[in-house]
Amino acid sequence: MFDNQRFQQLVEADNLTGEVISTNSFIIEVKGLDGVRLGSQVLFEDGQRGLVREAYGDRVILFNIDSEKIVPGTLAVVEADLLQVPVGKQLIGRVVDPMGEPLDNKGPIKANQKSGIFNPAPGIMARSMLNEQLASGVPAVDMFFPIVLGQRIAILGDSKSGKSTFLSQLSANQQGTDRIVIYAMIGKRKVDVETLLGNLESSGAMDHTIVVIADIFDSLTLSYLAPYSACAMAESLWHDGHDVVIIYDDLSSHAEAYRQLSLIQEVDPGRDSYPGDMFYAHSSLLERAGKLLGSDKTLTALPVVVTPNDDITSFLSTSIMSITDGQIIFDLNIFRKGIRPAVNAGLSVSRVGGQAQNARQKRLSGTLFQKMAAFHRAEEFSHFGSSLSENSATDMKVGQQIYAALQQTPGELYSLAEQQLLLETVLLGNGQVEIDIKALKQSIIGLKSDVKDDKEFDHHEADFLKKHSQPVDPLLLVTKPEDKTNATS
């Protein structure tokens, strides 16, 4: 008889059994388990678990899911043909590990369903066109690089460039909708985990969020499994009729964990020592997002990639960008200038964003890009030390006002209508008036009525401009501007 009751039950049920013959860190070699399926979940007699990775005749290679060392001679039994995790609504509002075990001291999770974590992506005939915007509450993203429900859009940037702040804002902005957020934290420090959980709790976002955590003290295998487990939880809710947003923070740590496991396993390394199937590991994960034909429900994926020194040309960065439908890049140099959010407008793009915008929003986005381009040209001229022409000075003024309007603290969130009112009011002034941006924002947020048609927009914008502006001295427009702190790339 075995001390582990679950192990005893599986053995008595005549499940395949084997014996550990060698271990190397998180790699376990088992003799027996003949005919076992790749991806099966294995239970060891000491209660630890493993994932079947490779099979060579009567020898099987497993990843150790847990952190404790397994000694040769330990018996193993197949627990399930697929590695499965609990899924369903019971996980909403909870913090779990990649195996679905609770980490929040709120008691056990009574999930009624389980799902395999390596599910195939929906086929092309099961998908529908993307056409509805996912509002993040951040004008620098929503008005320039709209995220569409069902899209896969990468979030790139160096450490401490504002990525996590933006993702927390996006999560909080889903309050009041039926959308559920799955936030996978991979290989993170305890302080980063606590900061995120604190932000989600304080904003109320935790009520519609599932947080999956594999921190730096967990096993490499848990870090490798975390995004797939989170995706399985998201897919279950998606197929049950919910719009779901999943955040993978971050796939750089996931790739690092997979690289270490592969090197320990003595897999031949490829570029940057990553295994040869690194691209497949991420593409098979991200392809699981989309919009379902019939229900029109969506799974939106936001993979995060850390770009040291703002280098977006690395293997991992370019690999993720080639899989996704766009990228939002946070620039550390812009962040250091005090601009929040520090989005690099020149390198960011949303390839399907236009499909979710109406005609007025498209005109606004186009005008904003034109005004920002004119601002940068005028700024370059100002470096020569001579006075600016009236047109260039106006371009400078408009650009500075746009940047002031885009400046945003972590606690600020704006609906799409509020963002349009804010930026269209600034453009309406055309640099000919001084605008009190702070007072303008307060008035727009205080406007509780739902502004829908063009006449209402035009009326409110003219009214806001009249209330919160005063004429600019014409003599000031042709002098060299002294404030260049708002420049960006």
Question: Language-model segments: which ranges?
Answer:
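Acidic-enriched and Gly/Ser
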Residues: 2-136
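Conserved nucleotide-binding/hydrolysis micro-motifs of P-loop NTPases
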Residues: 35, 67-69, 82-83, 100-102, ...
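Conserved P-loop NTPase nucleotide-binding/switch module
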Residues: 162-166, 170, 176-180, 185-186, ...
